[in-house]
Amino acid sequence: MTSESWRTIPHSAAIYEADITDFLEFFKANIKPKGITLNTVLLKAMTMGIKNCPQMNGHIEFNRRLVRGKIETYKDINISMPMIMPSGDMMTINLHNFENRTLENMQSYILDVKRRMKKTDLTEAMFSVSMSDTLSALKKGKLITTLGRLIGAKTGRHKVVTSRGKDKKNYNSIPADERLTKENIEQGTITITSTGSVYRGSHNTMSVIEVIPPQISAIGIGSISEKPGIYTDRNGEKQIGIRMFLPVLLAFDHRALDFGDLTPFFKKLDDIFATPEQMLKW
């Protein structure tokens, strides 16, 4: 998917940096005591932004030879989010139907995913998705793509080795609600990754992330950092002080979107970070 992404998608990106000082203080005083993590709150904020800019939440099909294609947007927001397995490996999880979930529901959903990860065989899970994608490509007439995937998966030094016999039977006997299945790691409608949760306090800022086809957008949440900034105090006066800033990267497929199409997303984030009281209604 990574090689296909860079080969077929004309990537463009915008880096958004928000002063979240007041937002962070409100979160610590009113939301964190309820057991809700900052990652969950930021995920909710991104979801609200996506709802305000539905063009982001979609898939594109494009025929390069005929120079034509179609874009399909979705009401359901199914988030592809990379998460670290107990083994230390990375797996992209599909967080289904996050468009209307409350903070509490989002938090419990993510905790349940982490619980099920403990009994999940990464190779088996990824192979099931790969075969499903391959069959889907075959149904669309993509014979060369299908053959390439099958040959790559089953031959050579890097072939996929799945369990067999008794081991496979034992793994398949684990109830679906106790492990992650194909439905949990299949393609979502949009990708959100949080590098800030992996390396807190990092001074890095992402400049680009890959858009996974057929998705048309990907969001990267960076690490919160202290910086001098200009803000308005309670008396309405401009001041300079140490503030907390959050970088957010939005990468998109330029065939489907222009920067102007994305302004509703950024304006919604502006509103959320300026009036954190709305978190109480989430």
Give the ranges of each region predicted by the language model.
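C-terminal catalytic/motor cores of large multi-domain enzyme assemblies
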Residues: M1-W282
